[in-house]
Every structure is written in structure tokens, then in C-alpha cells.
Amino acid sequence: MKHASEFLNFIQERGYLYQCTNIEGLDQLLLQSNYIVAYIGFDCTAPSLHAGHLIQIMMLCHLQKFGYKPIVLLGGGTTKIGDPSFKDKARSILPVENINQNTSSIRRILEKMVSFNDSKTGAMIVNNADWLDNIKYIDFLRDIGAYFSVNRMLSFDSVKTRLDREQTLSFLEFNYMLLQAYDFIELNKKYDCRLQIGGSDQWGNIVNGIELGKKLNLPELFGLTMPLLLNAQGKKMGKTESGAVWLDDNMLKPYDYWQYFRNVDDQDVGRFLRLLTDVPIDEIRKLESLKDQEINEAKKVLATEVTKICHGDKEAELAQFAAISAFENEDSSLLPDYIIKKEQVASGISLVDLLHDTGFEPSKGAAKRLIQGNGCKINDNVVNNIDHVINFESFKDQPFIKLSAGKKRHIKVVVD
């Protein structure tokens, strides 16, 4: 479908456009005003965002490139409840102190990837705790709650699916929909925000906000959803068997981040290049047309470009150089370091513990299974003894050991 506005044509071509509450109306608004304020919300349930959030972050950047103003809404208030959308059970209630720490950490990550300044298109960071923490319950029920139909709320797939499974939905969680809807109203009144963007799982919450705006006689509000970032197997991006693919380099090294995208399924390369990088469409078409072993060159481009956006050009180039040197030139010295203390080596470190401590395996049980399945190597030699111990004898030939878990995960273990 061809649109009048360049922005909608762009996001449709790159695969961002999933649903819109009024696509013709939004198209005309973008065409007539040449300026719009839009927001994307992020929960503060963890100290870092992960790879699954990249599609939202890229959308923030694209809004700026087209001359629009993006608002990042951090859910310092709503995280105290937790979004029940398509969840099997209630999230654990986080202490307020943890939520505040997570909010600060997420802000630092976003500031590396999105341009925040006082210009017309400079992004803003807003925390919904600023207004939600001060709500008076009786006033909120009377002024806002009166506009919500419980029957309608129960009809949304995000809620209906959970109830159909006879899984409990607490009254606390049920209130989340009202609070997110109210966020849109606050952002419209304070910043003239007319557009909310979110993942496809947020459709019900977004529609609630738009309908509330109508009942409060606000200018027409719009909602736009993007597809969830799934891999070829239909699993959400951002999580692996050994943990989440964090955007914070203190939680996941740029080298491992690069490797994650280097190892995506062949079928995902073109789509991820469109959604997660700024590589031009014509170049993407050439890269995704590569076959057999040549597709690996496209994967390297994907990994490097995605790493540049998250960690900067220098870290991306270092990660690529280290990976190519280690795998193609067999130079283990360029692998990322994992440092262990002399005292640990003196007393001996269990290989099982080391696989777990490095983050290669999520548990000691998984580490044992890897070893027993001949999936662990030290200096390219298979080790299948779960009682194997790393000591000073392990370092007699060189100042480090190369530890491998499977074919694609490698690290250099160094004694401090």
C-alpha cells in the first residue's frame, strides 16, 4: 500500500508497520503538519534492555531522521504493577529501589543510541512515575475509571488468552491498562503527543489510550504497532539458552553481542538488516540474495552494523576483527578475556564452574551436559570429563587457555 507520507512508506518498506488505528488519518497528519510528537514506552523490569528492544530503539532514531520528536517513556510507575499482556502469570513485584536503579541504567543505554537534546527533533526521556505516583485513587476512579468498560477490557486477546487458560489475573495487573491509557493522555496534554508506537502485543493497551482520548475530547490520537522481533523458529529475539542478549556492555561484551548476530539463521538476515540497521534497501537486497557459504558475509555485515549502533564503531570493528582472526586465522590471542585470580588457579577451578561463571552455560547441570556431550574444548581439544580441573598446569604452554563451548562460543581465560 502506497502512502502519501514518506515516513509511512519508509517504515512499511523496512518491515516496521504491523497495525495502525487509523492509517489514513495518520498519513494525512504526517503530510500536513510535517511534524509530530510520538512516544514509545519501556518497562524497567531489568537493569538493561535486550536485543528484543532494538526494533523500538531503531524506530526512535527513524522518527528523528524524518524530523519528528520522539519521547522515551520509562515505566517507573507502571513497572510497580507489571504489564500482564500475553503473560502466563503475574510478574514478581520489584522493590522501588530496584526499579529506580533500572530506570537510571536504561536511560544510560538509550543515551548512547538515540540523540537527546533540546532541538526540535531531540528525543526526551520522561518517567511516568512523575504523575502516576501522585494519583489520588478515588479521583482516578471517578475521572478516568468511569470511561472503561470491563467487558471491553476482557475482550482483548492479551487478557482473554490468560483467562481462557484459567490463569489468575490479579486486580493489580488489571489496572495496568488504565494506567498506560492515562500515560497517553498526560503526554498529549504536556507535550502535544499524538502517536503511540509499540510492539504488536501492546495493541489493546494502545487502543485503550486512544479511546480514552476520544471520551475526554482530545485531538485524535493515533496508535501504531510493530511486529515482535522473532527469529526463524518463532522465538522472541533477545534471549538464548545461556541468558539474555543484553545491550549493556557490562552485562554482555560487544564481542559476544557481535557473535550473536553473526550466528542468526540464514532466513533472518534480510529482515534483521531492514529492522535493526541503517543499511540501504538496495544493498540489503544484494546481501540477502547470497547463497550457501556466501550468506556468511551478509551475517558479518549484520553483526557489525548492529554492534555499531549499540556499542559504537570502534567496539564493532574490534569485535569483528577478533572474531575473524580467531575463526579464520586461528589466532586465539584476540579473543575476549575472562580473568581469573591466581588464588583460584592455585586451589583449582572446576571446568563445570568455569563454564557457568563465564556465562557459557546457564547452570552447572547444563555445563555438565555440554562436557559429557563432547561440546567443550580447551585449546581446541575436547574435554569430556566433568571432574576436569583448571590449575597452573593448564597454563604451562602459554599465558592463557582457549575455552570453547560448542562451535561458536569461545573465550580466552587469563590469570590475573
Curated annotation (Swiss-Prot):
Keywords assigned by UniProt? Aminoacyl-tRNA synthetase, ATP-binding, Cytoplasm, Ligase, Nucleotide-binding, Protein biosynthesis, RNA-binding
- Any one biological process term the GO annotation gives: tyrosyl-tRNA aminoacylation
The protein's matches in PROSITE patterns, at most eight in alphabetical order, are given as: S4
Annotated ATP binding lies at K239
Could you tell me which InterPro entries the record lists for this protein? aa-tRNA-synth_Ic (IPR002305), Rossmann-like_a/b/a_fold (IPR014729), S4_RNA-bd_sf (IPR036986), SYY-like_C (IPR054608), Tyr-tRNA-ligase (IPR002307), Tyr-tRNA-ligase_bac-type (IPR024088), Tyr-tRNA-ligase_bac_1 (IPR024107)
**One Pfam match, by short name?**
tRNA-synt_1b
Span(s) of short sequence motif 'HIGH' region: 44-53
Coiled coil, from the record: none
**Compartment(s) where it occurs, according to its Swiss-Prot or TrEMBL record:** Cytoplasm
Family per UniProt?
Answer: Belongs to the class-I aminoacyl-tRNA synthetase family. TyrS type 1 subfamily.
**Listed name of the protein:** Tyrosine--tRNA ligase
Tell me what organism the protein belongs to.
Answer: Wolbachia sp. subsp. Drosophila simulans (strain wRi)
Q: Which gene encodes it?
A: tyrS
